[in-house]
Amino acid sequence: MKLRDLCFLTLLRDAMAGTCSTEAATLAKSMDWTLENQVLELAQLHHVFPLLAQQLLLLNPPDLRRDVLRHWAMETLARQAMATQALLVLTGALEKAGIPALVVKGAVCRSLYPSPDLRPSSDEDILIQPEDLPVAEQVFRSLGYCLQSSPEDSVQIWYANPLRVELHCSLCGSMTIAGQAVQPWFDACFSRSISWNVGEGTVRTLAQQDHFLYLILHFYKHFLTGGVGIRQLCDICLFAGKQQANLDWSSLWTELETLSLACLTWNMLDLGIRYLGLDSRAVPKPERIPAADSEDLLQDILEAGVFGSSSLERKHSSRITLQAASAQNRKAGTVRAALFPSASDLQSRYSYLQKNPWLLPAAWCARCFGYLREGRNLGVRAASAAKIGRQRVALLEKYGILNCKI
């Protein structure tokens, strides 16, 4: 393992536990300015910069830019604390209007960390029932929120400084895995919902079993496309460790096997056990689940950045993995597939395609200009995207997610 990655994972593990280990202290003594920069750049890529900044401030390695790191950490703390307060005001207003609203991921996951506001969230996800949408929209507008997406979108995006909210009427929509519709697993989630302390107050959220399964499905969704960052894995490991008494692992493994996600999940948890401080006793594994082989998964996660956003090539490679997973195109691992996806594949990024699919060539041009703006040859970038796509499809095959080859 690269020294950069070892330092990154060690500091992150300690931040999740609220400790400074002897191992981290030893590594810190040998860190020079170059290595510190590399570790912090990786932390920035994965949106865990404040967590690692705090650890470095505690360890104080040579050449540390203390003033810069302290400023970043304090700024994040203040911004995140204000966003959490705004969330509590919003959920309180929804409740007062008679709307059951469940906060998912975000604030709930942050509360698992020793210093919750150092785990940044770019937005908050709120789940409501479809029949409550008109009244919910009135509540958002009454609090000064502006709708930043089309009213017809399946997920509405609302913003009022300092809070950005994704408003959902369905957790999984039409998502299917291994031929199974996922949404029915959550049809009764409102009746099972619980109250959750997020530090400054309480919110309603999914029951622990529902929430943990949803975190895994959310990991899978991003893993299937451009890749998933380390922060999501941290959330899952902390949830598994701190909520072990409220998780029925026998039922979870059965559900995950039905969805062909048991192998991937166990390899995720194995990384948590080996690198992120997860107690193996918190996640009992049935003997029928194959032994973990998770190093390739770790490298894919480290290279991906948050939501697979580390590079344009990786973003564009998602078309290859999606097509392979749906078995619609067994020759998807080509330069053409990376450069010229279908209109339906690009609608989420270029919203004008939803009503005007004939503008698809314009979207292709926009993608190509995106490559060129980063200053590299278009063909080289497309070939690189195809290569990443093929490598990632091999990972999907390894963890039992698909059986087709490209």
Named regions from a protein language model:
Residues M1-S122, I128-I406:
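Conserved NTP-donor binding/palm subdomain of two-metal-ion nucleotidyltransferases/polymerases, i.e.
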